[in-house]
Structures are given as C-alpha cells and as structure tokens.
Amino acid sequence: MIICSTLIPVSAYADNYYISGIDISEHNESVDLSSLKAQGYSFVMIRLGYFNHLDNKFYENVQNAVNSGMNFGVYLYSYAFNSSEAQTEAEFAISTLSTLSAQAKALMTYPVAYDIEDNSISSKL
C-alpha cells in the first residue's frame, strides 16, 4: 500500500475555465488553507473516510476550510464489494455530513465523490 502524505493537486476544466484545488486527508500534516487560497487554489476535496470509518482529521479539515472561507467537497474511499456494503458507505456519508454546521454546509459547494482505486473493486464496475 502506498500512502501519499503530500498535497495532491486537483484541477477542473470546462469551457476554457480552469480552477485548481487540493485533496487532503489525515495523511497530510496541518494544511494552511488560507495560504493556499491566497496562492490561487479555489477548493479542497476532504477525505470523509473509508468504508464506515471516519478520517481522523475530517472535522479539523472541514473547520480549516470554514475558517479560510474555501469551498470544499468530500470523498469517501470505497471498500464496497457489493450493493449492501455500498449502502453502508452511503449511509455513513449521509450520517456524517448531516452533523456539519450550517456554515460548513454553505461552503460545501463541491460534490461527495466516491474514490475507487482498488483494482479488485473497479474491475467489477
């Protein structure tokens, strides 16, 4: 298993419009989102967790996004091998996101993404 502890750039393109952001999780050191926003980063994708386990820095990372005024989305690393496990993951995500403050929900303008990297899962899609 490879664990990346650096910030992962994320970009989005549409109709000659370009925005850039980062992907963060518990594997990153503290991230100064205010500084990154000043450098031109528009958004951050925050790892919610994996399967039904919360990322240890999820709430801290969300609060940092709120404090910096940076828009964000979240992603869940999937370990689901069947529809029942996928439902467990979805219910976990919904339950966790329902606890966010109104201020955090207002800044969550990017999607809830499903991160599927395991070949034994993605090959069955």
Q: How should these model regions be labeled?
A:
Residues I3-I19:
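Sec-dependent signal peptide cleavage junction
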Residues D15-L125:
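Substrate-binding cleft of extracellular glycoside hydrolase catalytic domains
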